[in-house]
Every structure is written in C-alpha cells, then in structure tokens.
From Swiss-Prot:
Coiled coil: none annotated. Heme b b562 binds at residues 83, 182. Component of the ubiquinol-cytochrome c reductase complex (complex III or cytochrome b-c1 complex) that is part of the mitochondrial respiratory chain. The b-c1 complex mediates electron transfer from ubiquinol to cytochrome c. Contributes to the generation of a proton gradient across the mitochondrial membrane that is then used for ATP synthesis. GO terms for biological process: mitochondrial electron transport, ubiquinol to cytochrome c. This is Cytochrome b. One of its GO terms (molecular function) is ubiquinol-cytochrome-c reductase activity. GO terms for cellular component: mitochondrial inner membrane; respiratory chain complex III. Binds 2 heme b groups non-covalently.
Length: 382
C-alpha cells in the first residue's frame, strides 16, 4: 500500500514541500531564516489575534485598551510583549534572509526574489500601521510624519494624504482603518509566502557555492527539519528572553504617553528596523527627493539581478565582492544609528555620506567588482 502522504492530494503538497523535498546537501545555517520567518509570521498572527480580541480602535480608548490588556487580561502582558518584540525578531530574520540572498546570489531566481521584495514591503507596511495602534505619542506623530510624506507627490499629494487620513488630520478614522489594514495584511502576507515557496520549489534552493546542486541532494526531512528546529529553539529563547526580561528595550519611551496632537515629541523616529530608510529620507533636504530616495532604498533590490556582472553566482569565491558586501552591511548599521539621532551636525553629514555610499556600493561598485573578478580569473598565457 502506498504511503498516504504521497497520495493524498493535500498531504502530497506538504510532503513535496517539507518532507521529500530534494535539498542541496551543503546549505548552511544562513538557510534557516526562511523557516524562522514562517514561524515569526505564525507567532505574530496568533498573538495579534488574541490582542485584537481586547483592543479597541478608537482614539479615546485605544491607549487605555492596551493598558487594560497588559494589566487585566490573563497573560496579556506576555502576549503584547511577544507581539511587540516578535516584530523585531521578524525584521532581524528578514534582514539576514535578504543579506543571505545578496551574498550567495539567490536573487538570480528572479520570480522568487521579486515576490520576496514585495513581501518585504508588505511586512514594512504592516509594521508601520501596527505601530500606530497603541496611540501613544510616537504612534501618533510617526503616523502624521510618514503619511504626510505622500503630500510630496505632485498634483494629487494633498488630496491623497487627506484620503488616507479620512479627514484633515490623523484622527479616529485613521486609527480605525489602520487597525483594519493591520488585521488583513498578515493574511495577505501568508498567501504571498505560499507563492514565494511555490516559485522557490520550481527551481530548488540555491547553495553557498552557487554551483548546480542537482548532483548531490538529500531529503529535507530529517536532515533540515532537525536543523531548522535548532534555529527555532534559539530564536524562541531569544524572543522570550527579550519579551520577559527587557520588553521595552527596543521601544520608544514616548509611546508610554497618550497621543497628544498639541505636543510634539523632541525627536520623532520610527522603530529601529526602519531607521536606515528614515536616515536616507532625512539626508535629502528636498521633500520629494527624500521620498524617492526612501522608496529607492528598498526597490533597489528589484534591480539586483540586472546588476550581476560576475560569471560566478555566489560571493563565496569572490573576495573583492565580499569586502563590498561587508562594507554595505557596516553602512546599513551606520544609517540605522544615524536614523535614531537628532537632525544636527555631525549626524547630518554622516547620514548624507552613508546614503550616497549605500547607493554607490550597490549600483556602481558591486557590478565593477564582478567585472574585475571576471578579468582576474581569465587565464593569461604569455
């Protein structure tokens, strides 16, 4: 009798995706983040669902309802802390996952990569609207500042902003619709993740060498299920430690003050995972230019396959490209730091140089490094 997991229409899909999936035998721990992102998404949806049962999306009661969750709901404090810090873990895994894709040339699977970039944008949108919901000072002013950026769009800008706000300022209508968006987007993300996996399984996984792995593949289960479970345990331990011992480490103290339209916080800044893009936005004095640079900082990932000039896929055997990659990583850390600093010297100049070098490394230096490495690898007989 044939095994049911290989014949049942639904079980067959699960079997071909997570059990009998032929996987390269040499993929490293950098390939763990896909499964970790899946786990993060499930954790966020579940904790979010329980929070939504007690939350009220009304400007008068939103802040109090969050306080009520933390004080009066059974384990509400834990659910809220896991949800808030789970977002940070989600982005940490996302950035490492994207970084892995850049380093090992995974962007050459164009369909998978493009869906991945759209996923990144959707997750960022979800996190932004979610940050507005507790209706603290930073929630309110963050929403005001970021939505206001759309007014830089010529001709329709102001109308568009008022349409998104549902009035002439960030108010009850804005909070209600942001809650609706925050509720629906994770399920859209879930559907897109399925498409992401569908495209990935059309080609199979890449591997650290960037070479064709078809000659040496092993079943996903038990080898990589065990490996993923190890990564899962480490992630959950980190998340729980963060949520229980220092839940407010990554948050903003201003968000403990209820939203007040008459009082602007001294430094308006988003959560840490948006700071790099925020720094790029602030480094351009022109409003429209800043918005375009902000969009370009993420959308530049879409042209990565076009900028690939090397004959090799992975950076594993390309030391010049490796150096540039780690320079880019350091650059992003600097941008993240600058995004959290006040708009004054020397931070303005550092931010501008870091923004210029971010785009220069990706658009100019990396393709040049690929061409140089190609030249150096050519045999030169006397």
């Amino acid at each position: 009798m044939t095994n049911i997991r290989k014949t049942h229409p639904l079980m067959k899909i699960i079997n071909d995706s997570f059990i009998d999936l032929p996987t390269p035998s040499n993929i490293s721990a950098w390939w763990n983040f896909g499964s970790l992102l899946g786990v993060c998404l499930v954790i966020q949806i579940l904790t979010g669902l329980f929070l939504a049962m007690h939350y009220t999306s009304d400007t008068l009661t939103a802040f109090s309802s969050v306080a009520h969750i933390c004080r009066d709901v059974n384990y509400g404090w834990l659910i809220r802390n896991i949800h808030a810090n789970g977002a940070s873990m989600f982005f940490m895994c996302l950035f490492l996952h994207v970084g892995r894709g850049i380093y090992y040339g995974s962007y050459l699977y164009k369909e998978t990569w493009n869906i991945g970039v759209i996923l990144l944008l959707t997750v960022m949108a979800t996190a932004f609207v979610g940050y507005v919901l507790p209706w603290g000072q930073m929630s309110f002013w963050g929403a005001t500042v970021i939505t206001n950026l759309l007014s830089a769009i010529p001709y329709i800008g102001n109308t568009l902003v008022e349409w998104i706000w549902g009035g002439f300022s960030v108010d009850k209508a804005t909070l209600t619709r942001f809650f609706a968006f925050h509720f629906i987007l994770p399920f859209i993300i879930l559907a897109m993740v399925v498409v992401h996996l569908l495209f990935l399984h059309e080609t199979g996984s890449n591997n650290p060498t960037g070479l064709d792995p078809n000659s040496d593949k092993i079943p996903f289960h038990p080898y990589y299920t065990i490996k993923d479970i190890l990564g899962l345990f480490l992630t959950i331990i980190t998340l729980l430690s963060l949520a229980m011992f220092s839940p407010d480490l990554l948050g903003d103290p201003d968000n403990f003050t209820p939203a007040n339209p008459l009082n602007t916080p001294p430094h308006i800044k988003p959560e840490w995972y948006f700071l790099f893009a925020y720094a790029i936005l602030r480094s351009i004095p022109n409003k429209l230019g800043g918005v375009l640079a902000l969009l370009a900082s993420i959308l530049i990932l879409l042209i990565m396959p076009l900028l690939h000039t090397s004959t090799q896929r992975s950076m594993m055997f390309r030391p010049i490209s490796q150096t540039l990659f780690w320079m880019l990583t350091a650059n992003l850390i600097i941008l993240t730091w600058i995004g959290g600093q006040p708009v004054e010297q020397p931070y303005i100049t550092i931010g501008q140089w870091a923004s210029i070098s971010y785009f220069t490394i990706i658009i100019i230096l990396m393709p040049l490094a690929g061409m140089l490495e190609n030249y150096m690898l050519k045999p030169k007989f006397p």
